Regions:
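Single conserved hydrophobic/aromatic residue that forms the stacking wall/gate
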Residues: 1-7, 11-13, 251-257
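Long, internal stretches of domain cores in catalytic or enzyme-like folds
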Residues: 17-18
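Short proline/glycine-enriched turn/loop segments at secondary-structure junctions
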Residues: 200-204, 230-237
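Short, structured beta-strand segments at or near domain termini in extracellular proteins/domains
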Residues: 239-250
Length: 257
């Protein structure tokens, strides 16, 4: 009887705390948020209202001709949700095959992205190492906007296939140009002045601006530099922003050999 009374009092106490806003922060709550799983197909129209982009609007996300093109029209929140889904999908397979689980997939931090973009060339202006935008044959080395209103001199008007142009020395394609990329990091114009060199990442839940790197097909050369920074709001999708995922890879020395 005493135990039953104690349980009843405990239940009543919890109900009272749930009704009382002043004590509500003491209770464990699960925060849920609904996120669209499909790209925003209207970004081609919304980003460029006076341009004839109906073919991209109608076909980019569905026609087989675009199956090797980078995904765009994805907000930062959607990109993070995809990383979580990919982790769950991969580890479900690992469990089924009795294999060890992998670390979480995620967006790269701003510092990780720049390290990868440099491709082992610390002083490089662009991912290919040189300060020039043309190769020795006079061909552009990335998909961007060479001049005001000129989108076609690099043989690409919009985004192109993900493995277009040459990769950097880490064998990564289009680290500059084609589509810009979300990073995990929150944007602060003065972040480099006070972040730790051991963990150079700004990740603030209250900061809605997220760092975007790499430049895109609609950007001038300045944004293609591996040191250039830009941002977009985390709930905004664009026709020129995509993403790539990373995760910490663990392996034994035997596997490395």
């Amino acid at each position: 009887t005493d135990n039953r009374r104690q349980r009843q009092m405990c239940i009543r106490d919890r109900l009272e705390r749930a009704k009382n806003p002043q004590s509500r922060d003491r209770l464990p709550f699960i925060k849920k948020e609904e996120i669209e799983i499909y790209p925003d197909t209207t970004v081609w129209i919304k980003d460029f209202n006076y341009s004839y982009n109906e073919p991209m609007h109608n076909d980019y996300f569905s026609h087989p001709a675009y199956q090797d093109y980078p995904v765009v029209g994805i907000s930062w929140k959607q990109a993070v949700a995809f990383c979580n889904w990919r982790t769950h999908y991969k580890n479900s397979y690992q469990k089924e095959k009795n294999k060890p689980l992998v670390n979480n997939f995620r967006l790269p931090t701003e510092a990780e992205w720049e390290y990868a973009a440099r491709g082992g060339i610390p002083a490089g202006t662009y991912p290919w190492g040189s300060p020039y935008l043309l190769n020795d044959r006079g061909c552009f080395l990335a998909n961007f906007k060479p001049l005001r209103g000129d989108y076609a001199s690099d043989q690409a008007v919009y985004a192109v296939e993900a493995k277009s142009f040459l990769p950097n020395d880490y064998n990564l394609y289009n680290m500059s140009g084609n589509v810009a990329e979300w990073t995990e990091s929150s944007y602060d114009p003065g972040a480099y002045e006070y972040v730790s060199s051991l963990n150079p990442n700004m990740s603030l839940n209250d900061e809605k601006r997220k760092v975007v790197r790499g430049g895109s097909w609609k950007d001038v050369a300045y944004f293609l530099r591996v040191s250039s920074r830009d941002y977009e709001y985390q709930d905004t999708a664009r026709s020129y922003i995509g993403f790539r995922t990373v995760h910490c890879l663990l392996y034994t020395s035997d596997a490395a050999d």
